[in-house]
Amino acid sequence: MNSTRSEKLEAFGRLPDILDGLRVKCPWDRKQTNESLRTNTIEETYELCEALMRDDEVNIKKELGDLLLHIVFYAKIGDEKGEFDIKDVCDSLCDKLIF
């Protein structure tokens, strides 16, 4: 929990690289679309809410990871369509947070 900023950025940076590989090598990941992921995203959101209500730190961490995967997955699909990528998502969020 005392990770440095560099360690945090490195950990986050691994995720898009792993997903890139999965989109090539894994048939399930390769066939996913925004629509096919949508119900899974809703399910993962409910699982996070349940973990939060139970104050279950182990499952909060797990479910946050699952949702983070979905965010990166949607951004990857957007990138493949030439619409946006994870940088655009992060920039949009940061621009919204800065007032």
What function would you assign to each model-found segment?
Residues M1-L64, L69-F99:
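Flexible "arm" and connector segments at domain edges
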